[in-house]
Regions:
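Active-site-proximal beta-strand/loop segments in catalytic clefts of secreted hydrolases
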Residues: 1, 17-21, 51-55, 113-117, ...
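Flexible loop/turn segments at secondary-structure boundaries
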Residues: 1-2, 22-26, 56-61, 119-121, ...
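Carbohydrate-binding surface patches
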Residues: 93-133, 166
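C-terminal beta-strand-rich structural cap/linker in extracellular carbohydrate-active enzymes
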Residues: 150-169
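Hydrophobic, well-ordered secondary-structure elements that form the walls
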Residues: 40, 74, 111, 137, ...
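Acidic, glycine-rich loop-and-beta core segments that form the ion-binding/anion-interacting portion
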Residues: 1-9
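Aromatic/acidic polysaccharide-binding cleft in carbohydrate-active enzymes
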Residues: 11-79, 88-96
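Solvent-exposed beta-hairpin/edge-strand motifs
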Residues: 127-146
Length: 169
């Protein structure tokens, strides 16, 4: 990307701000936001994704504070990828319609997996240069909003996890 060619050598940071995406409470119209954040962070090598419309019809909340589904999608990244974390190498598209990014910081590893397929996907993850015994999981899907999920046990630096259809884990 142009950023890597021009700005990165100068020590500049790239922040991507949101733009209008036709999205409502329907998970299938929300999934492009998750894919966009993945692309911005992985392909674009951005340092941040900023969503600045909070209470607004296209924002994260209604005027009464009710969270829209898009807030939970963004939250899948924002809650777990904290200041000071860095993106680390991951197979960005390990399966058709599955997008993965990984981050490390504060002695933790965060993997964000987006399954935009209409079917569940059993995905194997292999960790390198990290020792992890288990992961806590959180999912946003058609029926869940950043809901705590099952623990993922790691054996020999590898684990397999089922990613529900149209979900962010």
């Amino acid at each position: 990307p142009l950023f890597q060619q021009k700005a990165a050598p100068l020590g500049k940071k790239l922040w991507q701000t949101e733009h209008y995406v036709n999205s409502d409470a329907n998970i299938s119209t929300i999934m492009p936001i998750a894919k966009e954040i993945h692309d911005v962070m992985v392909t674009g090598s951005a340092n941040a994704y900023v969503y600045w419309w909070i209470p607004h019809a296209n924002g994260l909340t209604a005027n009464d504070g009710t969270l829209f589904k898009r807030a939970y999608v963004i939250g899948q990244f924002a809650k777990h990828v904290r200041p000071g974390y860095f993106r680390v190498e991951a197979t960005a598209t390990p399966a058709t319609n599955v997008y993965v990014s990984a981050y490390a910081g504060n002695g933790k590893v965060v993997i964000v997996a987006v399954n935009s397929s209409t079917a569940a996907v059993s995905q194997t993850f292999t960790l390198q240069n990290a020792t992890v015994s288990q992961f806590s999981t959180w999912q946003t899907s058609a029926s869940a909003n950043m809901a705590a999920g099952s623990e993922a046990s790691v054996s020999g630096n590898s684990f397999t996890f089922s990613l529900p259809a149209q979900s962010i884990t």
